[in-house]
Amino acid sequence: MNFLIKPLAAGLYFVATPIGAARDITLRGLDILATADLIAAEDTRTARKLMEIHGVPLNGRKVVAFHDHSGESAVARLISDIKGGKSVAYVSEAGTPLVADPGYELGCAAIAEGLDVISAPGPSAVLAALTVSGLPTDRFAFVGFLPAAKEQRKTEIASLRDVPFTLVFYESPKRVGEMLANLREVLGGDRQAVVCRELTKKFEEVSRGDLGSLADAFAGRQVKGEIVVLVGRAGAQDVADIDVTQALRDAMKTMRVKDAATVVAGALGLPRRQVYQIALGLGDEE
C-alpha cells in the first residue's frame, strides 16, 4: 500500500484504530502511523499487528507502551519528545483514544505545554452502536463503565433515571446480565434498550427490546466479546403528557407548528416526530 509520507509537525496525534475489522482504519490514520517519529500504544503487540496487517513499516522507529498505569514519568518522557520536535502518534488498543481508553492525562499535559494535539478520527464503538441501535441519536450521553459493586451501580443508574438523552454504556460480558437486571429494577422494564456485542466482528450481534425482555434474555447467559448497552432516554414513553401539550400550545402562539414541535422536543428531550404529531393534532383542534 502507498502511504502519504511527508514530515509531520511536532505534536501529539491521537489515532483511532479498528474496534474489530482491521480494514476500518482510515487512510489518514495509516499515513500518520507510517510517518510519526514515535508511536505510543496502550498495547504494543496490538499496534504492531495492526501495522503489520496494513504493511506499515517501522524503519527503526520505536513503539513504546503507554497505558493507564504508566505514571507521570511516562507522560513526561513523551512530552519531552514532542518539545524536542518529534511527532508522537498515540493509539489505544481499539477505537478512539480517551473514550473509556487511556490518553487523557497525556493530552492534558500536551495542551498545558502549549503543544499541538491533533485528532485522526475513525472507529468508535459508541458511534457504531448508536448507528445500529434504532434509538434517538440527536442527544446522547456516554456513561462508560458502571461501578462493579452492585449497590454503587444501582446508585449511579438512579442518578441517570431522568436524563433526557439516549444513554450509552460499556460493560464486561461477565456482568451484562446483572447490569440489565439492575437497569430494569431502577428504570423500569418498559424502557427501550439495545445490547450490541462484537460490533464489526464475525459474530456481531444486536439485541433490541425493552429492558424487561433483554434482562430476561441475558439472565444466566454465557456472553463473550465486547459489549455496548444503550438505553432509550427518559420521557420518551410520556410524550402525550399534559406538560408537552401545554408547552406546544404556548409555543404555537408565536411559532409555526413545525418550529414549535422542534423547540419543545429539544427542550423536553423527546423524539421530534412524536411531538410533531401531537402538535398537528392541536392544530386541527383550532
Q: Where does each model-flagged region fall?
A:
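Glycine-rich, flexible N-terminal cofactor/catalytic loop recognition
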Residues: 1-66
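Short active-site oxyanion
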Residues: 33-39, 114-118, 166-167
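General beta-strand structural signal in soluble alpha/beta enzymes
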Residues: 41, 92, 117-122, 169, ...
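Conserved helicase motor
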Residues: 65-72, 146-149
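Short Gly/Thr/Asp-enriched flexible loops that form oxyanion-binding sites at enzyme active sites
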Residues: 98-113, 180, 184
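Class I SAM-dependent methyltransferase SAM-binding "motif I" and its flanking Rossmann-like core
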Residues: 105-163
